[in-house]
Amino acid sequence: MTVRDGIKIDVPWCNSLFHKEYKSEVASITTPRQLTVQKIENVFANEWCLRHHYLKRKLYIARNVSYGIFKNGLCFGVIVFGYPVWTQYKGVVPPHHPGEVPELLRLSTVSGLPKNTESFFCAKAFRMLIIDWKSETGFIPKVITSLCDLSQGFNGSLYRALNFTEHSRGKIGRPSNPGGKHGKWGGNADKTVAEKIMFTLKLGR
């Protein structure tokens, strides 16, 4: 097994959720405080999302900042923030510059973790993002945005627990189409844009 910067990077993705070491570690975690959060390579985060996030596809955005949540070098989840692809969005850009508004694009954790692990993970990542986003983009992040996909059974409870505010709702963004194309390229079979909620969180409050 290869370890780089304390991360076991070659645990087989195809069976990592059922890997003996993973199962043993998950069973040993009784509180989120046993876990650590650290910045990770976007390639690692993308591979995780391809295998374990419900959308089953990689992100192709040039400027991302990604974090993983770990115990004993094993990754139990990732969160990915990206530079927004839109140049304006009423009430968000303006007044802010797009570079000040990172979008929370992916959040994925394994099952069986203690209650409130995702909230713990997000809160840690938000604090780290203030420094790491500026290093990546040159901008100080002011607001985090994220889309909650109602068509996939999500209701926004995690966002509300993290003090996000509902900004708007409707057929926002691209089709969900888990496992398939989601843009206008490549013959996307799902042309219907899903009902979503855009949530925003002001940083530095």
Regions found by a protein language model. Give the residues of each.
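A positional "C-terminalness" feature that preferentially activates on distal terminal regions of long
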Residues: 6-14, 35
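Acyl-donor binding region in acyl/amide transferases
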Residues: 36-39, 63, 82-193, 198
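Short beta-strand-to-coil "C-cap" segments at the C-terminal boundary of structured domains/repeats
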Residues: 200-205
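A short, polar/charged loop/turn motif at coil->beta-strand junctions and beta-hairpin connectors
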Residues: 31, 43, 75, 96-98, ...
